[in-house]
Amino acid sequence: MRCLGIDYGTRRIGLAYGDELGVATPLPALVEADPAKRWQSLLATARQRRVTDLVVGHPLNMDDTAGPKAKEAEAVAARLRTELAGVDVHLVDERLTSYEAEATISKTQRRAVRASGVIDSRAATLILQDFLDQRFPPPLPHPAE
């Protein structure tokens, strides 16, 4: 299993990679200005890494409804299913992952870091790690004898 985590945005696409070891690692975000080039870079990354699973962040509202961003993520997932046939595409609840990722960066650095896509890739890492943790839960400790 080779997974690519995706935090899809209108200006940047955060990426993370993980496998059966169960550890998500951030990759450089896709920050091309042209959305078509960003999309092609996403497809190229998935092909180069020979991923078996794509994990797309699904930004549901706090009341579990799907707003415009969630519907956009659903459309992205559907397009990925079409363009990368044979790759499983999963939508994973990503509520507050961008805020959590941003909280790890000092306030003075956030503007520069946001433009570089670091926050987006950290969010993708959190999304993918959640998926991997569900797939590969840590073993329970052995009972003391």
From Swiss-Prot:
InterPro entries xref list: RNaseH-like_sf, YqgF, YqgF/RNaseH-like_dom, YqgF/RNaseH-like_dom_sf
Source taxonomy: Bacteria, Pseudomonadati, Verrucomicrobiota, Opitutia, Opitutales
Enzyme class: hydrolase
Gene3D superfamilies named in the record: YqgF/RNase H-like domain
The UniProt record lists the keyword Cytoplasm: yes
Lineage: superkingdom: Bacteria
Biological process according to GO: rRNA 5'-end processing
Residues spanning the signal sequence: none
UniProt cross-references to CDD domains, sorted A to Z: YqgF
Protein task: Could be a nuclease involved in processing of the 5'-end of pre-16S rRNA.
Name listed for the protein in its UniProt record: Putative pre-16S rRNA nuclease
Main location: cytoplasm
Subcellular location: Cytoplasm
UniProt GO molecular function: nuclease activity
Origin species: Opitutus terrae (strain DSM 11246 / JCM 15787 / PB90-1)
EC number: 3.1.-.-
Protein keywords: Cytoplasm, Hydrolase, Nuclease, Ribosome biogenesis
Pfam families the UniProt entry points to: RuvX
Family as reported in the entry's similarity comment: Belongs to the YqgF nuclease family.
GO cellular component: cytosol
PANTHER family, per the entry: POLYNUCLEOTIDYL TRANSFERASE, RIBONUCLEASE H-LIKE SUPERFAMILY PROTEIN
